């Protein structure tokens, strides 16, 4: 492992947590389709971020959860648990709900079956797992919805076209996300923001994100409506 750290393929922080290193991330950025997606999306993330000046992020669904591909943040923005190349919970975040709601049915069902033991459970949030102190306002333990509740939430997201989650990971934050559709019409990614829970402008956030998502979809050659 030390050799990988020296080669910048891995990095170890002061708490001993090992993460992908800069060189590994750069190598992935040049080759992975998801990184091509992130590059296509970046101008639209910048546009959203310039309006809201909080956190704007792009994510995809993989076997283990919600993988964050890109994040833009402004100084003084509300707390946000997302890290680039890190993962977020799939059942308690706006990004996760959008990705599951707009995934192919078989993909969503397979994912739910794989993680069924997490549904209806109260789980430790990752700051505790990594041995770090939990910042004020960050929930140390997160309750996931039951399977019937999850399915109702996903139906709501499909009907409304976006997901909004208040205070699931951070008490003062609201996550809002929309799908970015690929050529097959299903979600290739999710575009989301984290904003203050009581922000007066939140009703305008879904239309803003939908406009940006359509632009990304056009860039990908996908569905733009």
Per-range role (PLM):
Residues 10-11, 58, 180:
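A structural signal for short hydrophobic beta-strand segments in well-ordered beta-sheet cores
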Residues 23-51, 71, 77-81:
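Conserved segment of winged-helix/HTH DNA-binding domains
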Residues 78-169:
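Short, solvent-exposed recognition segments
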Residues 128, 136-225:
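Extended hydrophobic
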